[in-house]
Amino acid sequence: MTMESYKTLEIIRKNTDSSVFHLIINRPSHLNALSLDFFIEFPKALSSLDQNPDVSVIILSGAGKHFCSGIDLNSLSSISTQSSSGNDRGRSSEQLRRKIKSMQAAITAIEQCRKPVIAAIHGACIGGGVDLITACDIRYCSEDAFFSIKEVDLAIVADLGTLQRLPSIVGYANAMELALTARRFSGSEAKDLGLVSKVFGSKSELDNGVTTIAEGIGGKSPLAVTGTKAVLLRSREVSVEQGLDYVATWNSAMLISDDLNEAVSAQMMKRKPRFAKL
């Protein structure tokens, strides 16, 4: 399957035998600031990877010195100018709301992607970068990584997902403190808060370590992996009883599969399982 080219992103498959694909924010000269083009291209790229049977896991990273410096200020200014240019304030406000909803949907595309999306963070992860990683399924960073929920310093209420997703990751009080102060915090603090699962010593160690983890996930049953993601996301929004009912329904449809037979056979024969692509 031919990979489409993008202005703001790059898709790389580092090993032709691997089912791990890298989705890279590729605006290093702009510190990977998120432009309007990004919000159009990002969900398209994720959908392409989601539908590609060769893909089992996606690693999201940034080109150059930083993961993401937040929303592109020129794009932010453009949105503000367009929304205030009309004479009818009601219509201008409705237009702005549609733009915000469209940008929100671009971030939520991470959760809507069936395949696991792992964030590999180095350098700055600011504002919109935090929106991105809080939607990811797993997060890792290098020792030089730093984070900031920067929106209040731009007189904005963060509106692309951080305020909705971060409390369930780091706790309500921690999320409130970080969002109101906009303070910079380190990778080690992010680990202590539970925002990232591990801090690697360098970017190269991050790249190698996350790739190894992704390869491990990619070697498991794709039905089990995508199902686990779907059930966890669903369980976040419902009661325990409703979550149990959901997974019972899920497994009643998915459990009896060739993957189950292959996994059991591989365990008994002490060999690596071989699962069909999804």
From Swiss-Prot:
Q: What top-level class of enzyme does the UniProt entry assign? A: isomerase
GO cellular component terms given for this protein: peroxisome
The protein's annotated pathway = Lipid metabolism; fatty acid beta-oxidation
Q: Which CDD domains match?
A: crotonase-like
**Annotated positions for site Important for catalytic activity:** E151
Give the N-acetylmethionine positions (modified residues). M1
> Per the record's keyword annotation, is NAD included, yes or no?
no
Q: Which GO terms describe its biological process?
A: fatty acid beta-oxidation; fatty acid catabolic process
Name the InterPro entries for this protein.
ClpP/crotonase-like_dom_sf (IPR029045), Ech1-like (IPR045002), Enoyl-CoA_hyd/isom_CS (IPR018376), Enoyl-CoA_hydra/iso (IPR001753), Enoyl-CoA_hydra_C (IPR014748)
Tissue specificity field:
Expressed in roots, leaves, stems and flowers.
Which of UniProt's keywords are assigned here? Acetylation, Fatty acid metabolism, Isomerase, Lipid metabolism, Peroxisome
Q: Does the keyword Isomerase apply?
A: yes
Report motif location: Microbody targeting signal: 276-278
According to its UniProt record, where is this protein located?
Peroxisome
Quick one: where is this thing mainly located? other
Q: Which GO terms describe its molecular function?
A: delta(3,5)-delta(2,4)-dienoyl-CoA isomerase activity
Q: Where does substrate bind?
A: S69, G70, I71, D72, L73, G128
Catalytic reactions on record: a (3E,5Z)-dienoyl-CoA = a (2E,4E)-(5,6-saturated)-dienoyl-CoA
Q: Which family does it belong to?
A: Belongs to the enoyl-CoA hydratase/isomerase family.
Q: So what does this one do?
A: Converts 3,5-dienoyl-CoAs to the corresponding 2,4-dienoyl-CoAs. Involved in degradation of unsaturated fatty acids.
Protein name (Swiss-Prot/TrEMBL)? Delta(3,5)-Delta(2,4)-dienoyl-CoA isomerase, peroxisomal
Q: What is the lineage of its organism?
A: Eukaryota, Viridiplantae, Streptophyta, Embryophyta, Tracheophyta
